[in-house]
């Protein structure tokens, strides 16, 4: 199963579960709880809100020296990515260790081409990531940063961490 197919299937299962919870189909006593309860109110997507992507390069200082056969390093170049939508913010980062062959410049050039303002619904994860993948071949660090930030944003909107959305055990 491809990663995209898995994400699409997981999204449909999550959406279906949310419908059942919202109607009281599986979980009783949860529908209509105010914030502060165990299950947050679902976020309503719509209106004129648009996603906005921004990024900032920085040098990540490693807590411990990282060593491979040919060298050691105490820092790594990094680019932090933010996707903002209707007062919510998702974060991702592109880490570029030397052996990946990507640079801060190449990541920033790629991210400068990404225009998420054409999307009004961050839950269109597959459509958004297909668009991002189609911009250039390669640029995997930059694409991963957008992917991570988008998933973080959707988790923020749902009020849940992804391990819980996917039904995983936090331990």
What is the predicted function of each stretch?
Residues 65-68, 162:
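Glycine-rich, charged/polar anion/phosphate-binding loops
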Residues 40-55, 83-84, 89-158:
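Metal- or metallocofactor-binding catalytic centers and their adjacent structured scaffolds
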Residues 164-171:
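Metal-dependent enolase-superfamily TIM-barrel catalytic cores that perform enediolate-based chemistry
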Residues 74-80, 156:
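Conserved N-terminal beta1-alpha1 strand-loop-helix module at the mouth
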Residues 22-62:
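C-terminal segment of N-terminal export signals and the immediately downstream linker at the start
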Residues 5-28:
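N-terminal export signals
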Residues 69-74, 138:
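Short Gly/Pro-enriched turn/cap motifs at secondary-structure boundaries
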């Amino acid at each position: 199963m491809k990663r995209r197919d898995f994400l699409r299937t997981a999204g449909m299962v999550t959406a279906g579960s949310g419908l059942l919870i919202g109607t009281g189909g599986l979980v009783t006593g949860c529908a209509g709880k105010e914030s502060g309860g165990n299950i947050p109110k679902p976020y309503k997507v719509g209106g004129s809100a648009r996603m906005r992507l921004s990024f900032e390069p920085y040098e990540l200082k490693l807590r411990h020296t990282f060593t491979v056969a040919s060298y050691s390093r105490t820092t790594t170049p990094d680019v932090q990515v933010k996707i903002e939508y209707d007062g919510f913010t998702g974060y991702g980062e592109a880490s570029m260790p030397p052996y990946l062959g990507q640079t801060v410049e190449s990541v920033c050039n790629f991210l400068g081409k990404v225009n998420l303002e054409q999307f009004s619904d961050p839950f269109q994860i597959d459509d958004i990531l297909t668009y991002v993948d189609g911009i250039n071949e390669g640029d995997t660090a930059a694409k991963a940063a957008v992917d991570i930030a988008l998933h973080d944003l959707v988790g923020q909107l749902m009020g849940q961490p992804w391990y819980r959305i996917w039904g995983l055990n936090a331990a």
